[in-house]
Amino acid sequence: MKELLNRLISHETISTDEAKQVIFNISEGKYNDTQIAAFLTVYMMRSITIEELEGFRDALLELCIKVDLSAYNAVDLCGTGGDGKDTFNVSTTSSFVTAGAGVKVAKHGNYGVSSVSGSSNVMEYLGIKFSSDAGFLEKCIDQANICILHAPLFHPAMKNVGPVRKSLAVKTFFNMLGPMVNPAFPKNQLVGVFSLELARMYAYLYQNTDKNYTILHSLDGYDEISLTGETKSISNNSERILKASDFGVSELKQTEIAGGGSVESSAEILTNILKGKGSQAQNNVVCANAGMAIATSRNMSPHEGFAEAKESLESGKAFDSFKKLQKLSQN
């Protein structure tokens, strides 16, 4: 590790194979917490290369506990987090709206590191069971159209990193990796990233896979469609700038999509929206993101996807998916 750190501090880069080996070494407990923290810190101070990101991704996918949900042709809605915006849990809320529209969802998530409340914090608070049992996950996706894949259960090799990330409490390259390492290997993916540079890296790596994908970055910094400004969208066949008008709605103010200051208030926002008690701004931003997931899965326009998402939310189907998942979690 000493030699590696010296190279990285001297602005050298490492190869894909070397990046893979670092993750393998971390998983085998070869580095102490201080060394891991130093390694993560280097990548907060310099850009990651595509080769390095690819190596880290490949190692995590090789080491993860895999679950085969390929029969469901599911989509994952997952953001990198780390955008510093402290919105409510847009991707998680949008996942239930997507499920309510009849699109199967394999939602990858984790506890918050740089935010008050990550996807898993809210799901856990609301009584959603975390399991790596394939039978349980299939039952969830069959009956509720959605299953929750809590990252630590599927990436045990990374147990040594969790406490370090928590104590650092800022985004690290593991934020960049989260959406790439879903253990169900979903064929459809809506991924939000915290920078334009990372959006381009994702596009480069995804174009060499069989994924059907849409990568999003709001130009004012959000790792999702915020409707507070324009959003860069990169998919298999196109690059475009999305505006609020593409979904038939008006632009929002940033304060209108602010998150709760605690897990409890974040959970309340999510359930209120699904119950039909959300503000128009909250409903629109959720339907825009769910709409893009639906559009990605069903090969339709953002406007058409938005209409399906809105119907899912307003008809109560989104809340039904949530209630079914809650009920399955109690058995």
Swiss-Prot record:
Keyword Transcription in annotation: no
Subunit details: Homodimer.
Catalytic activity annotation: N-(5-phospho-beta-D-ribosyl)anthranilate + diphosphate = 5-phospho-alpha-D-ribose 1-diphosphate + anthranilate
MF terms (GO), sorted A to Z: anthranilate phosphoribosyltransferase activity; magnesium ion binding
Positions contributing to anthranilate 2 binding: R165
Pfam families: Glycos_trans_3N (PF02885), Glycos_transf_3 (PF00591)
Binding locations of anthranilate 1: G79, N110
One Gene Ontology cellular component: cytosol
UniProt keyword annotation of Transferase present: yes
Organism: Christiangramia forsetii (strain DSM 17595 / CGMCC 1.15422 / KT0803)
Cofactors (names): Mg(2+)
Free-text comment on the cofactor: Binds 2 magnesium ions per monomer.
Alphabetical list of PANTHER family matching this protein: ANTHRANILATE PHOSPHORIBOSYLTRANSFERASE (PTHR43285:SF2)
InterPro entries in the cross-refs: Anthranilate_Pribosyl_Tfrase, Glycosyl_Trfase_fam3, Glycosyl_Trfase_fam3_N_dom, Glycosyl_Trfase_fam3_N_dom_sf, Nuc_phospho_transferase
Keywords: Amino-acid biosynthesis, Aromatic amino acid biosynthesis, Glycosyltransferase, Magnesium, Metal-binding, Transferase, Tryptophan biosynthesis
Family: Belongs to the anthranilate phosphoribosyltransferase family.
Residues involved in Mg(2+) 2 binding: D223, E224
Pathway: Amino-acid biosynthesis; L-tryptophan biosynthesis; L-tryptophan from chorismate: step 2/5
Residues the record lists as binding 5-phospho-alpha-D-ribose 1-diphosphate: 79, 82-83, 87, 89-92, 107-115, 119
Chain sites annotated for binding Mg(2+) 1: S91, E224
Protein name: Anthranilate phosphoribosyltransferase
GO biological process: L-tryptophan biosynthetic process
Protein role: Catalyzes the transfer of the phosphoribosyl group of 5-phosphorylribose-1-pyrophosphate (PRPP) to anthranilate to yield N-(5'-phosphoribosyl)-anthranilate (PRA).
EC number(s) on file: 2.4.2.18
